[in-house]
Amino acid sequence: MKKLIILFFLGIYAFASIAQETDKIVGVWWNEEKTTKIEVEKKDGKYIGTIIYMIPEKYENGEAPKDDENPDPALRERSLIGLQILDGFVYNADKKEWKDGSIYDPKSGKTYDCYGWLESDDLLKLKGFVAGIRWMGKSSEWYRTTM
């Protein structure tokens, strides 16, 4: 009976550790250029990221930049503030990475498959790629910050 109780508590501890690990990506991050803040949150079991702030130098005539490069002309007038640029990430505990996601690049108007991992608690590395070829893509570093 003692062994069962010990195994039960070890199982709970292991589950709690994995749960904490999966949510480490949640928070606010500066993009690589430190011009944009992205809030990463968990929604419906997946991780998403939304632009919440851009430095004032990015504004023109007091207006936030628009999604000018979007391939859909109907979306080019929408503000980048509030735009979801990360979508669909799930945590892979074996590889300690968030995978199966996508990232939208407002500079090019393109969406890429993407995965990410934490180099440290304050450094998130993301890699966008096409055609399922992970090694052929572009990497980006994001830095944890506050609102």
Question: What do the PLM-derived regions correspond to, one by one?
Answer:
Residues 42-44, 51-53, 118, 128-130, ...:
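A mature extracytoplasmic/lumenal domain signature
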